[in-house]
Amino acid sequence: GKLLLLVEPGTPEGYGVLRGIREALLRRGAHVLAPCPHREACPLPPGEWCHFSCRIQRSRLHKMAKGGEAPYEDEKFTFLALSREPVPQRAGGRVLRHPYTGKGYVKLELCAGEGLLQKTVSKREGALYKAARKARWGDWLFF
């Protein structure tokens, strides 16, 4: 199947553009590959938007143009990957925020097939706890 990948700035406006495109293409039979794990309406409440961050190295010219000294920049973006072909629903969910790691537990905010989830994973959950500790914003966590 063909893949359509759309990327916009990680702003409310960029997210709004992709949310509208997502809704229109789903009505025409497209299938979401990422970041959403479902075909339902976005579960994020008004005022929040789905976005991710990627650290990129700055060139000398980039540093001069931005007037910055740091050798990197954290670029925020939002994206949408769609296919014409159906995709199987995966167990788990996409990590929407930086996980909070406490003593013996990890708290995560996830977008999953059943909507928005607040999940706490304890040390007693073994392999899932190890995966949750390593999970980063934007990762897929199987559970």
Language-model segment annotations:
Residues G1-E13, H31-P35:
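Conserved beta-strand signature within the Rossmann-like core of class I S-adenosyl-L-methionine
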Residues G1-K2, L18, G68:
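Charged, low-complexity, helix-prone segments enriched in Lys/Glu/Asp/Gln
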Residues P12, E40, V87:
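Surface-exposed, flexible loop/turn segments at secondary-structure boundaries
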Residues G14, L18-R19, E75:
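Active-site-proximal structural scaffolding
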Residues F52, I56-F143:
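C-terminal lobe and adjacent flexible extensions of AdoMet/dcAdoMet transferase-like proteins
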